[in-house]
Amino acid sequence: MSRIILSAASRVGNVRSNNEDMVLAFDRFVRSDVYATEFMTGNSDRFVIALADGMGGHNAGEVASSDVLTNLRFFLGDLPPRLSTGEFYEMMEEWLQSVNHMISSKGHVNPEMAEMGTTLVGVIFYNDKYYWMNCGDSRLYRYRDNKLAQLTTDHSLINKNGVKKHSNIITNCIGGGCKNSYMDMFEFTNDVLSGDQYILCSDGLNDMISDEEIARLAAQGASANQMCEAAIEAGGYDNVSVCVIIVK
C-alpha cells in the first residue's frame, strides 16, 4: 500500500482564448483550475489520473478532451475485477476504438466539430498493478534520484522523421481524423518506488521549458501549478496542464 500525493493544474496560458486541455485527477475533473489531494492505494482497487490535450476549431477541442476523460472514468469504473494484464490490455484496446469512433462520429454530425480530437496520457491503478498509457504527444515523465526520464514516446513527426520544425504535428490521437488510433500501454508495477515523482503534461509545458528546467522544478518539489506558472512565464503560447504524482 502506498500513499499518493497528487497535484493537478490546467491553465489557459497567455495567448489562447479558451482552454482545450483537461485533467482527470483521481476524483476531480480539472480545467482552468488547480486541485490537490492525497489518498492510499489500498482504499480503492482502481483509479485513473489522466490528461487530454484537445484540438479542433470552434472550441471542439474542449469537447473532445472532456468526452474522452469522462468516458474513460466511467469505463474504468465499470471494469470487472481481477482481469489479467492481457485481458486488461484487450479491454483498453476495445475502449480506444469505441471512443475514437464516438469522437469521430460527432465530427461527422456537427461540421463545427469536424476533425476534433485529443491526445491522452495517463496512469491507471487496477487490480494492484500500475499501467501507463499514451496516445499523441502529451508526456509522462518520472523523476527519480535527481534524474528525469521521459517514459512515453511522442507520436509526432519529430520522432517519425526527426524534423524538429514539425514537432507540433502529431501522427496519432483520438479522433482528429485518425482512423487507426493506437495507444502505447505498459505495466510498470515493479518499477514504482517510494519517492518517485510522475509528471503528466501537455505540450504546453515541454514546448515552453526544457527537460532540465522540469527536473529542477521537480527537485524543488514544485506543484503542478508551479510548473504551469513556469511555462506561462516562459511565454505561455499554448494551454498548459500538469499532474504531479508523488509516491510515498
For each feature predicted by the language model, list its residue ranges.
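PP2C/PPM-type serine/threonine phosphatase catalytic domain
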Residues: 1-248
